[in-house]
């Protein structure tokens, strides 16, 4: 049985070189699909590249590179988790991409 995936988990996904931050909510993730953003180690001045630091995660979440990933057909492993305050900042940045005003 596969692990339950939570918003804020960092995954290593088969055939994807960068770690992926799960940004979708837990109820959505129960489908076996997740929406996530890659975490790159290169610094950037973009307001949509948000730095995250935790025990084993150090990089920049690229909020504009949202991807729908089907974990039912890909191997994956949870390799970390980011703090709630970072999850809030990242989901706010993503929501800001779609705001009307």
Identify the residue ranges that each predicted region occupies.
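Conserved functional hotspots at enzyme active or ligand-binding sites that engage polyanionic ligands
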Residues: 1-101
């Amino acid at each position: 049985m596969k692990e339950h995936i939570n918003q804020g988990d960092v995954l290593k996904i088969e055939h994807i070189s960068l770690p992926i931050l799960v940004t979708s909510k837990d109820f959505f993730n129960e489908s076996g699909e997740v929406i996530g953003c890659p975490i790159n180690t290169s610094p950037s001045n973009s307001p949509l590249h948000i730095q995250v630091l935790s025990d084993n995660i150090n990089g920049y979440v690229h909020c504009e590179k949202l991807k729908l990933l089907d974990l039912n057909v890909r191997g994956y492993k949870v390799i970390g988790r980011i703090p709630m305050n970072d999850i809030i900042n990242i989901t706010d940045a993503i929501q800001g991409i779609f705001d009307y005003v």
